[in-house]
């Protein structure tokens, strides 16, 4: 009998920010296939005999290819197991959850998706930065800081984005290029506020604030490194001004 795969969003970092439904799924799972960026504390809730499989991806470390991860999910489900695919943030926000669902559908494997709190909103929020604020920002855009190398053409052009707030995920290692693009946007200037939030919502959270004119230098000086979220726009300082 075929099992089932549940994609669970683990939230932005703090283990207490997972949903009740997500935690319940972990407790019931026969197999937990987990990413690098999830809080390892969540694995303590798995059954004693549950199989825990690490499939993390991180620059500079061994990375599992998406095809390998897909294969694990399919094989374990075909063994009749209840499989939890535990992902940082939300499975469908730059989490490649859609690709995994398509693979499961190809093999007629039942699946469920349990949303998670995305780091795109929660990380700035916990750092005191709202992504929208009345009279300051009425729109926000979330983009990836590095696009897939196999894309035929670039889809994100920061020089043309008109949202009041731009949230960039996975962009710290590409910061210099991102800033160059943003400075070509008529809506931005060297004075536009920027924040880099590293390991957001956790006890190791660090925040670097600056402007498009000095953030690259500040990031180097303060040794900015992934994982992190970059926020661009007037909202960065809006709660500091009152």
Swiss-Prot record:
InterPro entries: 4pyrrol_Mease, 4pyrrol_Methylase_sf, 4pyrrole_Mease_sub1, 4pyrrole_Mease_sub2, CobA/CysG_C, Siro_Cobalamin_biosynth, Uropor_MeTrfase_CS. Keywords: Cobalamin biosynthesis, Methyltransferase, Porphyrin biosynthesis, S-adenosyl-L-methionine, Transferase. One of its GO terms (biological process) is siroheme biosynthetic process. Its EC number is 2.1.1.107. Pathway: Cofactor biosynthesis; adenosylcobalamin biosynthesis; precorrin-2 from uroporphyrinogen III: step 1/1. It catalyses: uroporphyrinogen III + 2 S-adenosyl-L-methionine = precorrin-2 + 2 S-adenosyl-L-homocysteine + H(+). It is a step in the biosynthesis of both cobalamin (vitamin B12) and coenzyme F430. Homodimer. This is Uroporphyrinogen-III C-methyltransferase. It comes from Methanocaldococcus jannaschii (strain ATCC 43067 / DSM 2661 / JAL-1 / JCM 10045 / NBRC 100440). The lineage of its organism: Archaea, Methanobacteriati, Methanobacteriota, Methanomada group, Methanococci.
């Amino acid at each position: 009998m075929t099992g089932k795969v549940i994609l669970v969003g683990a939230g932005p970092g703090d283990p207490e920010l997972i949903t009740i439904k997500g935690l319940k799924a972990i407790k019931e799972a026969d197999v937990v296939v987990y990413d690098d960026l999830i809080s390892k504390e969540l694995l303590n809730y798995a059954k004693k005999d549950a199989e825990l499989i690490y499939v993390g991806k991180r620059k500079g470390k061994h990375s599992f290819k998406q095809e390998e991860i897909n294969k694990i999910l399919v094989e374990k489900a075909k063994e009749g197991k209840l499989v939890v695919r535990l992902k940082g943030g939300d499975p469908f926000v730059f989490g490649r959850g859609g690709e995994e669902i398509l693979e499961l559908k190809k093999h007629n494997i039942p699946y469920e998706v349990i949303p998670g709190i995305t780091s795109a909103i929660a990380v700035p929020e916990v750092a005191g930065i709202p992504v929208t604020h009345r009279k300051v920002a009425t729109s926000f855009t979330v983009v990836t800081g590095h696009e897939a190398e196999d894309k035929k053409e670039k889809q994100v052009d920061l020089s043309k984005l008109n949202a009041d707030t731009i949230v960039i995920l996975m962009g710290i290692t590409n910061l210099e290029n991102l800033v160059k693009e943003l400075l070509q946007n008529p809506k931005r200037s060297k004075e536009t506020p920027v924040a880099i939030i590293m390991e957001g919502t956790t006890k190791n959270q660090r925040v670097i604030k600056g402007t498009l004119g000095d953030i690259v230098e500040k990031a180097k000086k303060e040794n900015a490194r992934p994982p992190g979220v970059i926020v661009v726009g007037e909202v960065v300082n809006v709660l500091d001004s009152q």
